[in-house]
Curated annotation (Swiss-Prot):
The gene is insB. Signal peptide: none annotated. Absolutely required for transposition of IS1. GO terms for biological process: DNA transposition. Keywords: DNA recombination, Transposable element, Transposition. It comes from Shigella sonnei. InterPro entries: Transposase_27, Transposase_27_IS1. This is Insertion element IS1 protein InsB. Transmembrane segments: none annotated. One of its GO terms (molecular function) is transposase activity. Belongs to the transposase 27 family. PANTHER family: INSERTION ELEMENT IS1 1 PROTEIN INSB-RELATED.
Amino acid sequence: MIVCAEMDEQWGYVGAKSRQRWLFYAYDSLRKTVVAHVFGERTMATLGRLMSLLSPFDVVIWMTDGWPLYESRLKGKLHVISKRYTQRIERHNLNLRQHLARLGRKSLSFSKSVELHDKVIGHYLNIKHYQ
């Protein structure tokens, strides 16, 4: 059971900035760890894949920013929309940008393939949060 889960998405790109790749993930505020993550486009389908990974965790309170798809997907659940309550996951986004150069907005480092992009970021999350 997770009492408070923060959800957010982070932008990255593969090859060119026009080829966007999004990391969607959920962060347990109390345990200070990533619970689940998925990669894809910034669509309801990608958010749905993340929600299906989170369904066994029985999250009590969802905390997100103001992206409209969160509101429509979390309808009927205890959902708080606030920048104040998403500070931890936003800080984690900054840490990811500092540790992984390919997530930097203005960087010479970038991924050349979708598979490599997902594997590098997924491996980092695996080492830092899942083991």
